[in-house]
Amino acid sequence: MKFTFKIQQYQTEAVEAVVNVFRGQGMHANAAYLRDRGIENKPADSQLSLLEDEEVYADTGFKNENIQLTDEQLLMNIRKQQTVNNIKLSSALVKDLGRCSLDIEMETGTGKTYVYIKTMFELNKQYGWSKFIVVVPSIAIREGVKKTFEITAEHFMEHYGKRARFFVYNSSNLTQLDAFSSDGGINVMIINTQAFASSLKEDGKSKEARIIYSKRDEFGSRRPIDVIKANRPIIILDEPQKMGGDITQKALKNFDPLFALNYSATHAKQHNLVYVLDALDAYNKRLVKKIEVKGFEVKNLRG
């Protein structure tokens, strides 16, 4: 079955609010680096050959290019987007994860998963960034995100002429991390904190913690966390308020992210907010059938 997706203006605006923060970055090809393939057992009489030349080529990895903008330029771009979207201007750049942490506030049911997938494609088109990690708070949301990637694949192929390679992190299938590192296209790792939270703590006692932070014989005596962080991934947090707050934020620094995008209808912690589609906006645009008001608080308004 082929799904047809209508591009909504508010979704385009949400994408542009993020992409425009990096205006001035320019287009850069993925930064190539020498990928650690780990220890491999080679024949004792191994000599230089065409085969070994091919193996050297296979050692190449592709990571996200660094942000060329200064903190002052990033903050200026953020404030421009806040002005456009009638949001209270940020006084400082928030750098909880990487160079900046941006908040995108979207009411539940308005297609935020579609929005951040489209944002990946636009960031790749405009700036060349291609390595992403989507972090979700539950298995149910993880499966929903995976399904959205599946059903929108043809849609984005039609618009961008390429597909995103996506996979769910599985500590028993670490070879996926090698493909994530060596492929130059758009690559997305989806991971849920319910299955991974204990391993976010480097001194965790769980099986997952021992795997991600320890050198694995079956993984060429490498630590999976080192393979992941070498790519300088862009972190996308789906419903971050459900992920354990500061503990998760601190642990995610182990991924050495380029920057972070937070998508939620109710942000528990404020970063640099660049787009808002609240319940009233969603209702006025007929995106939801009704809203229930139990009290109100005025926030994010300029003036």
Where are these regions (language model features)?
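RecA-like P-loop NTPase motor core of helicase/translocase proteins
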Residues: 1-303
